[in-house]
Amino acid sequence: MNTKSLAPSALTVVAFIFCMVLVMRPTVVSGASMMPTLHDKDVLIASPLAKRLFQPTRGDIVTVCLSANPLCGFVFSGDTQYVKRLVGVPGDVVRYGTCNIFVTTRTGQKVKDTEPTMVCQDRDEFKQIVLRERMYFVAGDNRGNSLDSRIFGPVSKSQINATVLAQIRLTWTP
């Protein structure tokens, strides 16, 4: 076997793995928690590199993993990865109920929740949390049908796997 012919193939495999781990990672939406923005089975292109190069920003759609597994997000990892909108950043005061989320920045500015949400009505008392450094509040756009920071609490920056860059909706009707 000629080792010169193997070198380009090996280099291609290494480049592909590098891209999948650091640059772009395909993710499939599972469920309706991000409706109407994202639909079940939408394919997303998420970038772990963008998360490392830029500070996560309010309004970003991110992938989040609650486990400490560094391979979370890969198909074979077995861990659940969530796709959510980042609504609260470090220093924010977040007040939330079943559906509504109210954010006040560290400078006292009230942030209007303008992201699309499905119809929902608050059923319980509002809770309040102040986000510490490197802590973020994430929520699904479909607030009445989302497992998010209102349930599992704020997430740390290390639990944010990637920032979503693009969405591909694959539909087929015969």
Regions found by a protein language model. Give the residues of each.
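Soluble "head" domains of membrane/secretory-pathway proteins
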Residues: 6, 19-28, 34-174
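N-terminal Sec-pathway targeting helices
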Residues: 1-13
